[in-house]
Amino acid sequence: MKNTPHGYCICPEGGIKLKKETYDVTGMSCAACSSRVEKAVAKQPGAQQVAVNLLKNSMVVEYDESQLSSAQIIAAVEKAGYGASLHAKPGSAPAAQTAETGGASAAQKAYSDMKKRLALSLIFTIPLFYLSMGHMMGWPLPACFLGMENAMTFAFTQFLLLLPIVYINRQYYIVGFKTLWQRSPNMDSLIALGSSAAIVYGIYAIYKIGIGFGQMDMDTVHTYMMELYFESAGTILTLITMGKTMEARAKGKTSDAITKLMDLAPKTATVERNGVESVIPVEEVQLGDVLIVKAGESVPVDGVVLEGTSSVDESALTGESIPVEKQAGDSVIGATINKSGYFKMRATKVGDDTALSQIVRLVDEATSSKAPIAKLADKVSGVFVPVVITIAVIATAAWLLTGHSVEFALSIGISVLVISCPCALGLATPTAIMVGTGRGAVNGILIKSAEALETTHSVNTVVLDKTGTITQGKPVVTDVVDGGIGRDKLLSVAASLEKLSEHPLSEAIVAEAEKESLTFLSVDKFEQIPGQGIRGEVEGQLCLAGNRRMMEANRIENSELLAQGEALAEDGKTPLYFALDGKLIGLIAVADIVKPTSAQAIAELSNMGIEVVMLTGDNAKTAEAIRRQVGVDRVVAEVLPQDKEREIRRLQEGGKKVAMVGDGINDAPALARADVGIAIGAGTDVAIESADIVLMRSDLLDVSTAVQLSRAVIRNIKENLFWAFFYNAIGIPIAAGVFYPAFQLKMNPMLGALAMSFSSVFVVSNALRLRWFKAKHTAAAPKTVSSPSDSGVEIANSHTMASNNEKGETNMEKVISIEGMACMHCVNHVQQALSAVPGVKEAKVDLESKSATVSVDGSVTDAALKAAVDEAGYQAVSIR
């Protein structure tokens, strides 16, 4: 299902356009609540996907507008006993600000409200507890509360102290009994039932005391004076409120990472309009506005530098610790800090389109989604409360039937009700997901969904696209070997000629000459020679620049230089030879060099038990050279862009759990096919739809970090779920008195309430440990390949070629880049021409990539293939 702008998404089934909306839900207190809300909305006609987040009190619904409306969704939630409203999204405010006001402030408000409730509850609970328990502790009490003659004063005063506590915490009763009446009890129902049972029994005790006085039965007065239970009811309510206060405080910290990011967003911007500078709110910045950013200021929005130079700190968004130098033409990201310098910029993305806003949106969507690991907790939550109520009733009846007192049996029933904690089940997963995704965002790792976060931890194969992922993605000059005319002279002649070419290798040579401030010479009669190189007259002298084939075609020899070129080619570099007036004057090697951290990252992934595979369109020789440098386990060479998805599928069919890492340019099908698609080096383009995880930096170490983070989060979730299940599995039997006959082990209701409160606090606090997650990066040396015999390089589709080689002859597959094709007629002409060449087994021509893939035997030469294409009226640019 693909998201589209303005909250719509396309459902692949029939192309139905679904609307996606976020709702604020009120009244939820535990997993049973979120489960009921989810079921109530999911059964509405037209509802496609419903995800309720207990931690954020939010709900995301994808639905068919032709069958369902937002009003009907809200009505369904209200019918279930809860409140709902569309999540406020001010049109003028960017998503970051919306998330800030909607998420962080909501958590702060909840914490503030709970603090007030707790403070007011304590004002009455402390004297109530002192009065009821003081005489047993030997604490001094006023004379009016001492002795049986003051039993009625003693009891009624406790009742009066309890009433404010009940009123302050009335929400438990309102929600608890309402959901109980609707046959969907939740945690509030357990609290309401437990405390109400204690209150009713206490009122019954007051009546029994009164009757005892009327009948002068002091034994009855004494008995019921000790069985009031008002302090249990009041203390239960206060302890649970205390736990919820601590929980609310902890919940507020789960979004600290995103809150810190949003705090970076500047509130104002300096804009230049009609030559006049003025300071305006950042919300009023429009596309195309010219903005001024001074040293120490935050960049207001995303844009491009027009003039000036600067050093920009992007660490908060990308995790890049070293400030990045910026000059005219460079892009800048909103909310980054201008550490030094002064520059003018043009706004290219404003409001909800800025990188910061999209980061917040992605994290918000991830925390609103559900991980598959939470399904068991969801199933248990749906039946948990009714089962607990049933256990409490059975336990109370059982102890009464075995001859125990009403007081004993009632304390058992109340303990079962108040110790049970469905809340811990509901918080186990979302707290860890929220903290984990927030921590990832701080490190420049944007995880789009809880499912992606969970799947990443089980990945056992990582497939890396070579260009732009393992390597820099841009050719640079690595070696300059002159044949006697001097390095600068060779580079000057080469750059002068190459400047007229648009080939990426030419650009690398020109850039090297410019970096060294060399002189560019005049060039005449420039000409491109397809499949060989270029030629022209440099200051009157004929200059040739190209591959070895070009030198041989022009009978230019220099065995020493040619041998050096072959050695450089063995290292994965591309040697370009230069000749002046028929004499070889030198060679320049160009390569797409490996990023500094690629080998370290691949070593880390291997140490985690993950197989690393590299996909590349390069030939086997170049692929093997890269493999030796970085230590990948296996290489699949000569892969066309459109075949990457097929290679991923082949790995999956072999039982692998695959993560694909690519730069997102031509990797979309492969990213979508993989179990986890990781787009690397996305920069400001954080909305790559095909990827599950977006890495802001172009650094493979972040892939290792993402896997480590995923494993840490899933481990934390498992710890939380274990605690939630273990706590209830042990606590409920103890509270029910299962161990009382053998060990005299019995749970006091107040202790049960305390345990329940701290169970939820424990789960949230455990999740908060993820705030200190830090990836472990080791400087381990990469694995090395000492000889070709242990090579892990394979040719794409080699398994297909082998099956066609029935007679045992050696077949090869070659890829021809062709210019001049414009339609399917062209494709047919080229395919027929190539198929007619003797020795060609199969020819496939692709218009989109402007290439042909041919399967040939050893007798077919490149010249024959080139001639066939040229004779058909097209141009074979290269053959590999």
Predicted regions and their residues:
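Actuator/coupling domain of P-type ATPases
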Residues: 72, 78-87, 91-98, 102, ...
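Membrane-embedded alpha-helical bundles of multi-pass transporters
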Residues: 137-153, 181, 200, 439, ...
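Conserved cytosolic catalytic loops of P-type ATPases
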Residues: 46-54, 58-63, 67, 228-230, ...
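Flexible metal-binding regulatory segments at protein termini and peripheral loops
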Residues: 1-153, 165, 251, 276-277, ...
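Hydrophobic alpha-helical transmembrane segments
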Residues: 160-172, 182, 196, 231-261, ...
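Residue-level signature of catalytic and energy-coupling elements of molecular machines
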Residues: 30, 37, 41, 61, ...
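Conserved ATP-binding TGD loop and adjacent catalytic N/P-domain core of P-type ATPases
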Residues: 19, 35, 459, 538-540, ...
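P-type ATPase nucleotide-binding
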Residues: 477, 481-608, 620, 632-648
